[in-house]
Amino acid sequence: SGGSGGSGGSGGSGGSGGSGGSGGSGGSGNNDGPGGNYSYTSGMDKELKQILFEIEKKENYEGALKKLEVYVYENPQNANGWNLIGFASRKLEQYDNSEIYYNTGLEIDPNHEGIISYQGELYLKTNRYEDALENLAVLDELCNFNCIEKKALAEAIKVYEEENSL
């Protein structure tokens, strides 16, 4: 499925993979939450799952960000860690940091569907619509039939288009 998908990899990075049918698309009403991509938590160690709980259940992005900074320092080859720190940074509107974190994760796993999707949402937040469309095209190539990451980005693009009369 495009090479990611819980494949292990160095440092236990795994990928977000073709999550086919795993739950909803996140909890915050705008299809933007790690729940949809991570409800199965494939490729995540116990520590990362605990941090994910901070994000999903408590929406404690600041607390999660502090823990994720330590986590990625100790696990620099874990693309899932970079994805979550990018997500938490984006939710805190730290867009420059978020972009750096997503790019770092993609250097580790260029086919990480979760990062590609979230990076596309970051592009929308920073008014880079064309870049978001490019990420959607990449997901089109990578994703299987029921790809939550692709659906989430497509929905975010649709909302962006409606809000900006595109």
Label each residue range with its predicted role.
Residues L84, Y118, A152-A156:
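Canonical tetratricopeptide repeat
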Residues E74, I108, E141-F145:
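Structural marker of alpha-solenoid helical repeat scaffolds
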Residues K46, N80, N97, G114, ...:
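Start-of-helix register in tetratricopeptide repeats
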Residues G3, T41-S42, L133-L166:
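Terminal, low-structured helical/coil segments at or just beyond the last alpha-helical repeat
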